[in-house]
């Protein structure tokens, strides 16, 4: 599972460099090295605490935030349990988004309440269906291209 967390963290770093022009990329690179070399998750988790933290970041590319969501969940599970399962995390997020969309539609809420969740659900479902260890960058890139083509 260490390899999978590092793959997701590496993809997050790529997204930060490629789409966000964010100084957080450097922080995450240091966290990557710290975890890879020393199994120390603390540098990564410290990015999420307090005002102005990585949690508060607003990204230009929606997929950056979605990869951040998965990676942060993995980091917290590693810290708590010593391991993580990306498929369980994706499944949990998909179930949450489905229940939120269902609740919104049953209560006749405006589409704006759940429109973002529909996008999240599409991305997380795509990962759940297509991800195998080692192919994250490839399928994320394909998803980004597909999304950009739809918006044109």
Regions found by a protein language model. Give the residues of each.
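Amphipathic, interaction-prone secondary-structure segments
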Residues: 24-59
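Secondary-structure edge/capping motif, primarily at the C-terminal ends of alpha-helices
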Residues: 16-19, 35-39, 104, 108
